[in-house]
Amino acid sequence: MSNYIKTDGASTVEAFVEVQLIKDGNYIVSYCPALDLSSFGNDEEDAKEGFEEALSVFFDELHKRGTLEKVLLNLGWGLRKLPVASFEPPEEKYLKKHPLNVNKTFNERLLIPVN
């Protein structure tokens, strides 16, 4: 399944994104190229939990500021207007490549309540 972001425009953002786990010294970095968003932890589970929190804060802040659409479009996402707004990820060639070796990749799907 490919990356997507959907929002009802009022209270919920649903995100499904690919996240890379990268060993960097004593830490594991969780990095999402499609959002240029990262977090880290002492182990994989800690890095995944940190990424979930970062993703939640990211969408909550964008929603509060009313800049979700603008930021996603600037990151290369495409907007489709359906009954709810749906964003398609940028093409692979536009994604930033992380300079470190990717150890593992996982998909993160979250339903994020936004205020």
Model-found features: residue ranges?
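Short, charged, surface-exposed hinge/linker loops at domain edges
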Residues: 1-16, 49-115
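Short aromatic-glycine-(Arg/Gly/Cys) micro-motifs in beta-strand/loop hairpins
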Residues: 15-34
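Residues within well-formed alpha-helices
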Residues: 29-31, 46, 53
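Short acidic, gly/pro-rich beta-turn/loop elements at beta-sheet edges
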Residues: 29-31, 40, 63
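A short, exposed loop/beta-hairpin motif centered on an aromatic-Gly-Thr core
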Residues: 34-46
